[in-house]
Amino acid sequence: MSNQDYKVADISLADWGRKEIKIAESEMPGLMETRREFAAQKPLKGARIAGCLHMTIQTAVLIETLQELGAEVRWSSCNIFSTQDQAAAAVAANGTPVFAWKGETEEEYWWCIEQTINGPDGWKPNMLLDDGGDLTAVIHEQYPDMMKDIYGVSEETTTGVHRLYEMSRKGELGMPAFNVNDSVTKSKFDNLYGCRESLVDSIKRATDVMIAGKVAVVAGFGDVGKGSAQSLRGLGAQVWVTEVDPICALQASMDGYKVVTMEEAAPVADIFVTATGNYNVITHDHMKAMKDEAIVCNIGHFDNEIDVASLKQYKWDEIKPQVDHVEFPDGKKITLLAEGRLVNLGCATGHPSFVMSNSFTNQVMAQMELYNNPGKYEKDVYVLPKHLDEKVAALHLGRVGANLTRLSEEQAGYIGVSVDGPFKPEWYRY
């Protein structure tokens, strides 16, 4: 490996990965159309992007889109279990410095991020693309002198966006940041429709359990929780929801879910899913109260929504990779998936390509906006303008056979919009 500018599990998986990438491209019209529109202009020529985002097949299509638009890219995964090794191999074999494999240790995880920051021949990033905020944090904490040369960061997920707003509030944000998560075509699609498909896929792959008839608890009823609850109910589970926010709790009630506390649910439910972005949502006491063989998993970004650390004192029995029995002193076992990390990427392959095309097209738009407009943005957090959000949606309509109605000039004037959009004000909630 000493003379190779990548580290993956098995480079021989590249051909398999390339075949899967080709299939994904047909399901990712937003990215492919963006390539066609901008490839000749090379709007990212000169951009040196350090990326830290789940190294999946879909991410491979994102990486190669950025490269088609002129960027140099170095990449790591933002989760120790989320890499698809065939995807990493295919990207590495194509000449991209990628440092990611499924089952990294914590130490290896941080080493991989480090490789994306410091490349050969003095290579340093001038753009960041992050998921969860770890790359951004490393730059701020360990490489503050580098920030003067970085145009900005685009952040993928709710947790990372929260970290950015906290840094901004404290005056600690050292570069402009785009909150990609809160583009409508990300949060209302990836977070909701993506989780609606990938959660049950991961539980099924991990356990083969019958979901119908089970009591399933979803902690958190944001977009991720909404999609998770829908998926479990769709397979016949009785779905309960825990919430701290009265608005979300009322939404859950109006959607027909029973809103309970985790203390009420713990002794009764069969399946537990955390989707809050908070920590210690399922505590040691909750797990002690659970039934034998209860299934416990997390679909939020970090692994601390479930107090997994408190379980280390007990006996663990690995059933298969990312599926563990944890045995309590009384002999009761719970089934913990992906060690409390993102279950849909630890036990399955994440969201489908089509919905990730929405999210990743937003990422490309954000990268182009930041790189091509130096000095336009302060060291603060921004969202993409409405017309770009609508453009991302429009790029995907043909793939699902949707035909838009066009306003007449009179109709557009009546509601005070252009016939070409944007069609909603910035504050519209969808």
UniProtKB/Swiss-Prot annotation:
Superkingdom assignment: Bacteria
Catalytic activity field: S-adenosyl-L-homocysteine + H2O = L-homocysteine + adenosine
GO cellular component: cytosol
Residue sites binding substrate per the record: 56, 131, 156, 186, 190
Native species: Halorhodospira halophila (strain DSM 244 / SL1) (Ectothiorhodospira halophila (strain DSM 244 / SL1))
Predominant place of localization: cytoplasm
Protein name as catalogued: Adenosylhomocysteinase
InterPro entries xref list: Adenosylhomocyst_ase-like_sf (IPR042172), Adenosylhomocysteinase-like (IPR000043), Ado_hCys_hydrolase_NAD-bd (IPR015878), NAD(P)-bd_dom_sf (IPR036291), S-Ado-L-homoCys_hydrolase_CS (IPR020082)
Location of this chain's protein in the cell: Cytoplasm
Gene behind this protein: ahcY
Cofactors, names only: NAD(+)
A GO term for molecular function: adenosylhomocysteinase activity
